[in-house]
Amino acid sequence: MKVTNDIIYVGVNDHQTDLFEGQYAVPNGMAYNSYVIRDEKVAVVDTVDVKFAHEWLDNVGAALGGTKPDYLIIQHMEPDHSANIYNFMKIYPDTTIVGNAKTFTMIANFFRDMDLDEKKLEVKNGDTLTLGKHELQFLFAPMVHWPEVMLTYDSYEKVLFSADAFGKFGALDVEEDWDDEARRYYIGIVGKYGMQVQNCLLYTSDA
């Protein structure tokens, strides 16, 4: 599914999970979001839950159309965003993983067999990465709702990849009132970090 001419949605729908994180009922499933940004260099934003590795990798391969990804951007280390890092790197071993210092500390703990010393790009808050006409800016969002979270802003397309900050329950192939499930998600998942989410709105408005 195209978001823009250069940004392709490669996420998956989950209708297998009854309780998200073991406590939130999701009668209409969940969507795990991931994107491919195509330019002179190609970036993949986030992975998905490990149960959907094959479907996600097929989606990524179709979006790449025979090209190889240059970067895998990890915005959040919760498993529904990061579980397929290892599977991805087995297929695309020359890819550089983009994250912050806390991201790479977590990767080292979650994926002990991975050696990323020459395959990582550690970014700081406000750093940019140029793919060609697309310039990506990384905006740290600690405790929205984990300490390593960062958002990615594409200044060319004016698209914000917002990790969990503005998420919702529900798969994308189910028609439902967006605001009801977004409100329930916010209250359950990130509401306790409301001040941090408000800060996201403030500093992304200046990006």
Regions found by a protein language model. Give the residues of each.
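Conserved beta-strand hairpin/beta-sheet module of binuclear metal-dependent hydrolase folds
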Residues: K2-L64, L151-D154, K158-S162
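Active-site metal-binding motif and surrounding structural segment of the metallo-beta-lactamase
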Residues: K51-V98
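Metallo-beta-lactamase
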Residues: K2-N5, G99-V149, Y193-N199
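Short, basic, glycine/proline-bearing loop/turn elements
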Residues: D70-Y71, K133-H134, E181-I189
